[in-house]
């Protein structure tokens, strides 16, 4: 039963990870291209366009998606996303300009150079779009790194658990064979067992806590389902009595 439940969960996590990788590559490619257009000088654009790895990855990924979904479908999706992103970026740009104007007036009233200090808030829609794309890419990459680190830590936990057991068995055999005095042997074995128990408690507390939390959540969902069934079952006799 455990294997039957673990395989679909692992496949779902893998599918989500693949989708997030594709999304991250698309976002980073779009953000990189937008950055070159908005924040770089024309000479820098010419120098970096030929040696941009993200651009090559984005082109390859776009060709792959065109093959899978079709050029027309990808064109419709990209145009829709661009229109939505441009509308959001325009609204944020207008808000930034309004905020910069208010802040400039307040700073000027205080005797400061408000126009110069609020220049950073005057973002065009294209610049806002670039910042949003990089922010979305950063969030996706953060999620991927969290997932990868979770898998690595889980694997390291298994490896450390096996290594801990091997070291305990080796220490146990070494103590039994090398310590002739029964009293000293008993004390050393007690110390070894204490260390092993403490390590087991420290390393297993987090995993057991998350496992218990998952069980509690499952029980809460089952209780809610039972309550819903009881309510529906209680409504049926009332409706029959009214009829």
From Swiss-Prot:
Residues spanning the signal sequence: 1-33
Keyword Secreted: no
GO molecular function, one term: voltage-gated monoatomic cation channel activity
Membrane topology: Multi-pass membrane protein
Catalytic activity: K(+)(in) = K(+)(out); Ca(2+)(in) = Ca(2+)(out)
Regions annotated as coiled coil: none
Annotated Gene Ontology cellular component terms: monoatomic ion channel complex; nuclear outer membrane; sarcoplasmic reticulum membrane
Lumenal side: 34-83, 157-185
Annotated TM spans: 84-104, 136-156, 186-205
Keywords: Endoplasmic reticulum, Ion channel, Ion transport, Membrane, Nucleus, Sarcoplasmic reticulum, Signal, Transmembrane, Transmembrane helix, Transport, Voltage-gated channel
Task performed by this protein: Functions as a voltage-gated monoatomic cation channel permeable to both potassium and calcium. Plays a role in the cellular response to DNA damage.
Entries under PANTHER family matching the protein: TRANSMEMBRANE PROTEIN 109 (PTHR14550:SF2)
Protein name as it appears in the record: Voltage-gated monoatomic cation channel TMEM109
Organism: Rattus norvegicus (Rat)
Protein encoded by which gene: Tmem109
